[in-house]
Amino acid sequence: MEKNTLIQSPVSLQRRRLLLAGGALLLSPSLALAGAQREETLSDDVASVMRGSINNVNPPRLVFASAQEGERWLSAMSSRLARYVPDEGERRRLLVNIQYEASRAGLDPQVVLGLIEVESAFRQYAISGVGARGLMQVMPFWKNYIGKPSHLFDIRTNLRYGCTILRHYNNLENGNLYRALARFNGSLGSGKYPNAVLGAWRNRWQWG
């Protein structure tokens, strides 16, 4: 698909970024459990609420009772994330975005960290065999329902969509996180994916 030209098309540039970011990600073992959210019909009210969440953009920041607590969290999580993201500055920026987007969606940031580990191993340009994209493996069809054409490989865009979608599923399941996680993965009825996410959370991402 990539052409040998000095001026590359957006598709070829995206292809190059995918390859540079992690090789042949479609074959990566880290994406073995990455599934696909199932396309569904949303009520106008639900779609409106989700669109409002997607479009409400404020600068990311740590959401803690004190700056000291936030710095302790950031330092601890940065050490744990180093195996996936070697650059310290990149780790800290990513963690601030994750903590902010999860918190604003009413989700536990630690569970979201576990989910991202399972979905993409923190690879920004990960893409699954069914087309799910980015850190939280968001299916592109969601843009038609709750957003506008966006670059789902952008870290903040991906986290905003992913956290909004997971919160939607959690609401749909009346706060049952286990079932919400299965819905997020498109595998409702199977415990493999929720157990993997909750296992990653318990083993590597618990806090406090």
Segments from the language model and where they lie:
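N-terminal secretory signal peptides and thylakoid transit peptides that target proteins
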Residues: T5-L25
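Onset of an N-terminal alpha helix
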Residues: S12, S43, A47, E71-L74
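Cleavable N-terminal signal peptides
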Residues: A21, A32-L33
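Cleaved targeting-peptide boundary
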Residues: G35-L42
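Catalytic glycan-binding domains that act on GlcNAc-containing polysaccharides
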Residues: A36, N56-G208
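N-terminal targeting leaders that direct proteins to extracytoplasmic destinations
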Residues: L42-N56
